[in-house]
């Protein structure tokens, strides 16, 4: 899903490297969030407050930077995944609404964010992300999509019985369908972009759980710090292949 160049947009080129880095970043955020809330035993609320502060600081730096910078951009993406992980776990477990309840709630918030963005700015295409207003909507929407992805990944892998390997296959298959739609249909590329962006999050979440969950539950039982190191290394490798020139997906 890559198209024409837009020098004004503050998002990276939507290439294969973009999607690989996105998945690696979401896996890093999943394991990082779990490391703080579980391994360090700080709890979901404290973890959410910590990562929310980091997320807000990263967004401020990203918005105040007047041109696209891949280091700032991908750090902000990782920040959205960590706060998304802890926020989803807080909603699902601490508030007791469960994976399905969390998925429904977060889906509603995501749709509302996209609708308000569309009504306010006239478009949700990423090549329009070139002002404080559009960037603010962009990062709020991404944060909701990352949070939804955590709940959706946990719901399919745990509650629905797919397991981690089954969840990985499910979301890879869904992304393959989106790719085919981008190649052989006239469906809006903006719609397909956001669909793919949303679904890469539960894929990253399931991969993260697969790395650090016990073998008895279908995981590899890596330590959360080891899984985070693995994810960071993978994210850094694909990040270097990310093109600096932004691109339109509309």
List PLM regions with ranges.
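Polytopic alpha-helical membrane proteins, predominantly small-molecule transporters/carriers
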Residues: 1-250
């Amino acid at each position: 899903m890559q198209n024409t160049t837009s020098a004004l947009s503050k998002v990276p080129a939507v290439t294969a490297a973009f999607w690989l880095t996105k998945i690696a970043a979401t896996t890093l955020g999943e394991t990082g969030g779990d490391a703080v809330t579980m391994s360090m035993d700080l709890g979901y609320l404290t973890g959410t407050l910590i990562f929310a502060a980091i997320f807000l600081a990263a967004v401020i730096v990203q918005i105040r930077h007047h041109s696209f910078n891949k280091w700032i951009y991908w750090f902000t993406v990782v920040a959205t995944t960590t706060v998304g992980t802890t926020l989803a776990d807080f909603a699902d477990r601490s508030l007791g609404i469960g994976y399905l309840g969390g998925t429904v709630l977060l889906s509603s918030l995501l749709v509302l964010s996209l609708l308000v963005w569309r009504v306010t700015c006239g478009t949700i295409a990423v090549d329009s992300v070139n002002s404080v207003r559009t960037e603010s909507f962009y990062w709020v929407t991404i944060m909701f999509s990352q949070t939804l992805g955590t709940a959706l990944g946990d719901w399919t892998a745990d509650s629905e019985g797919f397991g981690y390997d089954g969840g990985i296959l499910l979301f890879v298959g869904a992304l393959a369908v989106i790719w085919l739609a981008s190649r052989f249909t006239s469906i809006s590329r903006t719609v397909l972009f956001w669909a793919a962006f949303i679904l890469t999050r539960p894929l990253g979440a399931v991969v993260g759980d697969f790395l650090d969950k016990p073998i008895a539950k279908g995981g590899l039982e890596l330590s959360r710090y080891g899984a985070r190191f693995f994810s960071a290394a993978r994210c850094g490798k694909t990040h270097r292949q990310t093109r600096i020139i932004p691109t339109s997906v509309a």
